[in-house]
Amino acid sequence: WQRQLLARQPNNAQGWRQLAALQQLSGSHDKSLATLRAAYQKGLRFNESELDNLVLLAGAADQPWQGAKLLAGMLDQGLLPRTSAREERLGLLWWQARERSKSAQVFRELAQRSGSAKHWLHLAQLELEQARWQAGLDALAKAERAGAERSKVRAWRQWAESELSYQREKHVASAG
């Protein structure tokens, strides 16, 4: 019945929201996301919390890449103000989408602004996942200075240093 209502009144924003809410309640996060995206593309406008919800729906629908693209676009276009929470969400969505370099860039900027141990640890983990050992070690040092848990930093540092040492030995062996 909700779709019939939309067919008769396609510019009724409330109808689109209701259909998306019903789809979300029934567990069809992907359909709810598609409904809201269709409404948005039709030119219907949403408030800030609805735009945030659209991004969250992408994550709930197991579409982190879509969520990251949506959020990045909304931030770049000024549709949503840049906040630390949104930047962190963007970094996590890129990470879930396996776009580690984009995620690392977001967390690097966020960590530099916030000085948060959590953000430095996220950056360190991303750098280490990409076998960027020295960059990971640098981020770990900053995380430790920012108050990160020493045992976690120590374990990651030992692993990164052993990998870096192995890479150097391998390089020396191949050069000789």
Question: For the regions a protein language model found, what residue spans apply to each?
Answer:
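Alpha-solenoid helical repeat scaffolds
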Residues: 1-176
